Amino acid sequence: MANQRKIINDPVFGFISIPTGLLYNIVKHPILQRLNRIRQVGLSSVVYPGAQHTRFQHSLGAFHLMSEAIKHLTAKGNFIFDSEAEAIQAAILLHDVGHGPFSHVLEDTIVKGVSHEDISLMLMERINKEMNGQLNLAIQIFKDEYPKKFLHQLVSGQLDMDRLDYLRRDSFYTGVTEGNIGSARIIQMLDVKDDQLVVESKGIYSIENFLTARRLMYWQVYLHKTSVAYERMLISALLRAKELASKGVELFASPAFRFFLYNNIDKEEFYHNPECLENFIQLDDNDIWTSLKVWSTHTDKILSTLSSGMINRRLFKVEVSSEPASNEHIEELKDIISAHLGIHREDAHYFVSVPRIEKNMYDPADDSIDILYNDGSIKNIAEASDMLNISLLSKKVRKYYLCYQRLQ
């Protein structure tokens, strides 16, 4: 008799069991396998060298947590059909399939206005056609068009399996222990009330830890000033490459990457031209790094300086402040940099970037988690928690970054 499941050894959760059939067919599908070639945390390895883990590993981890959540919810008497269980497992495996290399950078440069969520859905529908409609229910739940709302919340919500995995995993691989949330404990505390996902009141401390960990990970890892500077360099390099391509300058690029460099692709085009999706699924981190390596010796001074800086970790200098940099200071920097590099003054903007980043420590729209008490009453975490100072956490933290080319 054929083996009924495949077992994958994961450093974070141990052995992950994947049943043969639809779910295993998704795991080995080329579109999911492509995520093996895309890092989960983009450029964060410039700060945390251990952060080499991939979006594929994250998808498997989220799948494992979903399997655990199904087990605990059904043990508490919440009825989930086998077909629904398989559908939410399929949906979580595919939830990140629309990410490109350095996803948010691409959304700002070469695939403008098309979010990875849009592309994930397009790819799910494409795989669904190949699989003769076996993903119909998964897509319905993913789009929140299925009557049982809590199933969608498990895939995409305040306490979804995506978040529970990436915090644990990113914490593990970066070594930033603050993100190491008690995902197993949270999953054991999950329940369903009035078709909404809730957490039993005895799990409240785990939720407080989860919310705090999430915010700490944002500032310590995802929005770390050095990672932000590195990302800004990549955005500048890609925008310069795009400008040169529009003037007909020959640039080294893989066929898929070339398609996006030499064509202007917006949301409308992406939806209606099948070539866009075909080329997109051929893109991974290797396309970008290979081009940067070759561009580092390009005759265009701007492109070669940015590319070699990326390759050799000569990063933009970065200053963080609670106030934006003055226009005079920015213009003065552009004067100095253009003179130092011997480039036209109007091209100096490639070497100075002033992103503003803001984040609520607690966002009611994003973090509203319901706590279920023994008497059946429900309170929002903001009311239920005696530890989280919600009014303080709800204040927006706004940081102004000034990233610019080093002069030596």
Where are the model-predicted features located?
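Short alpha-helical catalytic segment bearing the HExxH-like zincin motif
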Residues: I88-L93
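Short active-site segment of divalent metal-dependent hydrolases/proteases
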Residues: L94, G98-H99
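Histidine-centered, transition-metal-coordinating active-site segments
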Residues: M1-A87, P101-E107, V111-Q408
